[in-house]
């Protein structure tokens, strides 16, 4: 049986909710994370530290990788669909966004990457990987305190030559 190798990549988009500034009346804008502390302290509102957010992103990363592999194994025949690991990278940004009514969020633009070895067609690989990734994204195990949204975009599958 001929096994083909496929490089699979996707963008992983995360929104972290940081809180609401009730007295903020200016236009929506981007702001450096370090400048937010002063705004939150002026309203006596809890504000998550960068370390807390980094730990939450580490948890999401680890659990997303685990859940993806678990769902992939559930959806496929292990002897026909081989995968060793999946890598998710979610770098914490230095900027946050304050919406019109004071809602403060941080957007994380991350990546997903893996290699699959299978006898399935490229279309079948796309369908299975997309489904496993969506199931993993919907998993309750990914929930962390400040996670507001999690999605993938630009799923790309390329065959790797010999």
Model-identified regions with their sequence ranges:
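Short structural boundary motif marking the start of a folded domain
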Residues: 2-8, 98-108
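Beta-strand elements of well-folded, non-transmembrane domains
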Residues: 10-18, 108-120
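Intrinsically disordered low-complexity regions specifically enriched for long asparagine
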Residues: 1-6, 116-133
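Periplasmic peptidoglycan-binding/tethering modules of Gram-negative envelope proteins
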Residues: 31
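Acidic, low-complexity intrinsically disordered segments
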Residues: 35-96, 111, 124-162
């Amino acid at each position: 049986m001929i096994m083909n190798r496929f490089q699979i990549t996707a963008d992983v988009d995360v929104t972290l909710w940081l809180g609401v500034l009730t007295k903020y009346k200016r236009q929506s804008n981007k702001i450096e994370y370090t400048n937010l502390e002063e705004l939150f302290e002026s309203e006596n509102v809890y504000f998550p530290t960068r370390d807390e957010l980094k730990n939450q992103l580490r948890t999401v990363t680890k659990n997303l990788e685990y859940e993806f592999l678990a769902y992939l194994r559930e959806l496929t025949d292990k002897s026909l669909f081989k995968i060793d690991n999946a890598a998710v990278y979610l770098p914490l940004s230095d900027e946050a966004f304050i919406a019109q009514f004071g809602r403060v969020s941080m957007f994380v633009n991350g990546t997903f990457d893996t290699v699959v070895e299978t006898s399935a067609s490229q279309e079948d690989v796309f369908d299975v990987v997309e489904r496993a990734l969506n199931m993993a994204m919907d998993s309750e195990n990914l929930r962390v305190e400040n996670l507001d949204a999690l999605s993938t975009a630009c799923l790309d599958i390329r065959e790797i030559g010999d």
